[in-house]
Design a protein with these regions (language model features):
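Anion-binding and metal-coordination hotspots
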Residues: 1, 10-442
Length: 442
């Protein structure tokens, strides 16, 4: 019922009528789409299982399962239209913070063993060997979904931004915003794209990938100020009271195409956290050295094996013996970056605290992906046809939009888990001659 109020608030029934006027079909697209969205939130499963689950709703389906699969093809063909319409209609439910747009990418795996269409072998976020498809997602400043796109699993995700952003500019009427992303989607081309018109950018920056001169400046513990009052500080003389503060310094970072500001922040609390994590990893690396064993494959950059090196020692005429040792140079190099974080922006005159606050909001889009993958079970994907796969992700996107808008209407007082649990507990029973009666606690 609560999801239904969001559905009709977004005027998706009207959107379905507009779509019907362009296609020849007899089934009730509005009923199918709404049921797909509700079941994705309440009982995420396959399309056939969702159809069975929908039969338990107050208004059970009057359509058949084969109608659902036919509707998926229609929904896929209208994917861009539906996204732009729900964005415009979402203003009927409240203002959108569309002056800040967060962008990120993730991928979803398929239960197949061969590449097919856009389902390509690529770098899976979950380290799975299956073919994947990638998704680019924009959210507004409140973490409410705005638009998404799909692209092949083997494509560089940096190139996914321009087509989707162009769609937003042309179809959504949204052309004045600050683009915000992590360093992985902050190539110079993507920054230049948001250096034009009424757009700007705030992106994280890898300190290790800075030009040598700028990297050396960033690593120096001099020139920092306390963020709260701009008071200059000596990072080597911080007291215990100072360790909960955040410190920063900034400088121009100019390229042939861009005038930017580079902001370096230092957090003593984050530095202590990184040091503690690394101490555990060093302990595990020391055990590897003692045991004389080292994994050949390193799956991630935080693997303790990165601190283990090897050298071959030979005696004349004898086969080389491999000796493992702890790489103290590698450890010392990593320690230099403890507590440091970098952000780049073309908002040269804006307050540093405001810029950092926008950048910190990126957690919301990461939470969107977690909700889609874990709570809405958007993966693995079992569909084969490209159009039906598009429709699957469209319904996942719309389900996420409904869920976020509902949570906002509740002033964000519930966690994802709490709100889902509450929605799933809302049940009714059909009492003879009395109609439906609620059987849940408010």
């Amino acid at each position: 019922l609560f999801l239904q109020s969001i559905y009709y608030g977004l005027k998706l029934d009207s959107v379905c009528r507009k779509i019907k006027s362009r296609h020849k079909f007899e089934y009730d697209l509005n009923a199918i789409l709404s049921d797909l969205i509700y079941t994705r939130v309440l009982e995420p499963s396959s399309k056939s299982s969702s159809f069975r689950a929908a039969k338990q709703f107050l208004e059970p389906p009057t359509y058949e399962l084969h109608d659902v699969y036919r509707a998926l093809s229609v929904l896929a063909s209208e994917m861009d239209f539906i996204q732009s319409e729900v964005y415009k209609n979402s203003f009927f439910l409240g203002d959108r913070m569309d002056r800040i747009l967060y962008y990120d990418c993730t991928n979803y795996y398929f239960e197949i063993e061969q590449e097919d269409g856009d389902k390509k072998y690529g770098k899976s976020k979950e380290h799975r060997p299956n073919p994947i498809i990638q998704m680019g997602l924009f959210t507004d400043g409140d973490g409410i979904p705005l638009a998404f796109s799909l692209f092949p699993g083997n494509q560089n995700e940096q190139k996914s931004l321009k087509p989707l952003e162009t769609k937003i500019l042309q179809q959504f009427g949204c052309d004045k915003f600050i683009y915000c992303s992590d360093a992985g989607l902050a190539s110079e081309d993507n920054r230049v794209l948001n250096y034009m018109g009424q757009r700007a950018f705030i992106v994280t920056q890898s300190i290790k990938k800075l030009p040598a001169e700028d990297r050396a400046w960033a690593l120096k513990k001099t020139g920092f100020k306390r963020l709260s009052d701009d008071k200059p500080v000596d990072l080597t003389k911080l007291t215990d009271d100072d360790k909960n503060q955040l410190y920063y310094k900034d400088e121009p970072l100019t390229t042939k195409k861009l005038d930017q500001k580079l902001i370096i922040t230092y957090s003593p609390k984050y530095a202590a956290y990184q040091k503690a994590i690394r101490a555990e990893q060093i302990s595990r690396a020391e055990k590897m050295v003692a045991n004389g064993s080292l994994k050949k494959q390193r799956k991630n950059p935080n693997d303790p094996a990165r601190f283990v090196n090897k050298v071959a020692v030979t005696n004349e005429g004898e086969k080389a013996k491999i000796h493992y040792y702890l790489d103290t140079d590698k450890i010392a190099e990593e320690e230099m970056y403890d507590g440091l974080y970098a952000v780049c922006t073309d908002l040269l005159d804006d307050d540093v605290a405001d810029i950092l606050k926008v950048s910190e909001g990126r957690w919301q889009i990461e939470d969107c992906f977690r909700t889609m993958k874990t709570d809405f079970e958007a993966r693995p994907v079992y569909l084969n046809r490209e159009d039906r796969i598009k429709a699957h992700f469209l319904t996942c996107f719309l389900a996420l939009l409904h869920f976020r808008l509902l949570n906002r209407s509740l002033k964000g007082t519930y966690t994802t888990e709490q709100l889902l649990h509450t929605l799933k507990d809302i049940k009714f029973t059909d009492i003879e001659e009395q109609g439906f009666m609620p059987v849940y606690e408010r």
